Amino acid sequence: MNRIISINGPLVIAKGKFSIFEVVRVGEEKLIGEVIGIENDKAYIQVYEDTNGLKVGEPVFNTGKPLTIELGPGLLANIFDGLGRPLKDIYEKTQSIYIPKGIDLPTLDRKKVWEFIPKKKKGDTIKGGDIIGTVNENGFEHRIIVPPNVEGKIEEIYEGNFTIEETIAIVNGKPIKLYHEWPIRKPRPYKEKLDYNYPFITGTRVLDIMFPIAKGGSAAVPGPFGSGKTVLNQQIAKWADSDIVIYIGCGERGNEMTEVLEEFPKLKDPKTGKPLMYRTILIANTSNMPIAAREASIYLGATIGEYFRDQGYSVVVNADSTSRWAEALREISSRLGEIPSEEGYPAYLLRKLAEFYERSGRVRTLNDLEGSLTIIGAVSPPGGDFSEPVTQNTLRLVGALWALDSKLAYKRHYPAINYLISYTKQWEFVKKYFEELYEDVIEIREEFFAILKRESELMDIVSIVGPDALSDNEKIYLHMGRIIREGFLQQDAFDENDSYSPLEKTIELMRIIHKYYVTVKQLLGKIPLEEIEQKGIHEKIIKLRYKSLKEFREEIKAIEQEILSLLNSQ
């Protein structure tokens, strides 16, 4: 019989026979744990629940299985803890606002009936990853995938209403159900990785144009406390051009998950017109939950993302915040007595981060569909210090840095993305898309960067000698810098017209700002800049972002006329 011989917080040492990464039940309360190390007949067990009250000598029960998640209908519009247990079902069963220790509930609802429509017929040969049929889940076509380890001839296939436990087909004598299980630490197989080809449109202008990533790409959002990481992550979750959104609250405040739960059902998806919650999966592993489960929640989100990617959908996984997960790794590592690396983090921090971020990508699935998994990870460096290990190791793995700046946040510049230090490595991939549809945008974007850089340099001079010391040829950069910052880069998350900026609106806004800039440059030397400013055209451009699409188009025409009149006045 396996017995506990030592307890150190979430780390339990037991004597007996175990397999590495096996899920075990610890103590009389049968707490969920995972074997993370074996030494002779001793096993080091990471316990995913509170170990208060656990005693030395209590039994440890083997399950013989790794940590797995059930994948099938019922995942969407649901909220799970870090181990994939549905929080709503836990509350209905226990009437407790806390998760009781040792509770064992399946991820998917066993009673709900789904209408299964077969896409294959009796006698067809199928293999792992093939789509055998579909189920309608809140208007979403949930494609039922053959488990990757199954192949052969379909002996029987049924149509009709089934619970997820009932057999829908028989292949080589094996029953196929609406769901299958998959180990969360094991990436799901695919045929090949494909090149990026299409930008990941978020509805946030500064991300879509200045620092875009491709569908299947990855980005890090580091920033100090109060700089707007969570609001930006929620904005991406709300409006991203993605079929499925998985939002992982990893070690963050419970109120943030509550906000998402309250807001998303009220908001409509711009593509389908249905509540946003219908395409969203929430994984809540808040700061007061056991820290060991933070690691599980990150892999859980990636596995669910890969499952929908394998159905040919585009998926985005939002992890807020990976720093809390790294802190959990640091705590477990120190309890194991491992030699610490920089700032006390384990030496394998980079490998662990890579295991997560490398699961992103655009792939050809086993059933020859194209799917993508985009990963966006928030990082919370203490004091906003980007040189700390989690931020530095993350930047080695991701395709873009969206750096949040508390100075911009205090100036009420939202999203507070520092446009001088942020970057994207994926511009070359998405550039082709813009070249085909909006060729002029590439040049305008470069000009915007040049103006903002020059404005920043001149602001240092202005802070010492004042703006009057500058010539009009220099003042134009301050004038245009303000228009770009306030009229284009800034975005109001709480304004119904400005919260989500369709790409068409973003491009038109860029063009009108650029048109105004070219006109003012032509007039410099003929009219003083002060006189041009008095016309007030720039104020109208700045306010454009608050207009609805219909008003926006009308206002653009009026501003174009004013710019033309200004040019013809000379």
Swiss-Prot record:
One GO molecular function term of this record is: proton-transporting ATP synthase activity, rotational mechanism
Catalysis: reaction(s): ATP + H2O + 4 H(+)(in) = ADP + phosphate + 5 H(+)(out)
What superkingdom heads the lineage?
Archaea
One GO term under biological process is: proton motive force-driven plasma membrane ATP synthesis
Q: Which InterPro entries match?
A: ATP-synt_VA_C, ATP-synth_a_Xtn, ATP_synth_asu-like_sf, ATPase_F1/V1/A1_a/bsu_N, ATPase_F1/V1/A1_a/bsu_N_sf, ATPase_F1/V1/A1_a/bsu_nucl-bd, ATPase_F1/V1_b/a_C, P-loop_NTPase
> GO CC annotation: what is one?
plasma membrane
Q: What is stated as this protein's family in its record?
A: Belongs to the ATPase alpha/beta chains family.
Query: What HAMAP family is this protein classified in?
Result: ATP_synth_A_arch
Name under which the protein is recorded:
A-type ATP synthase subunit A
Q: Which organism is it from?
A: Nanoarchaeum equitans (strain Kin4-M)
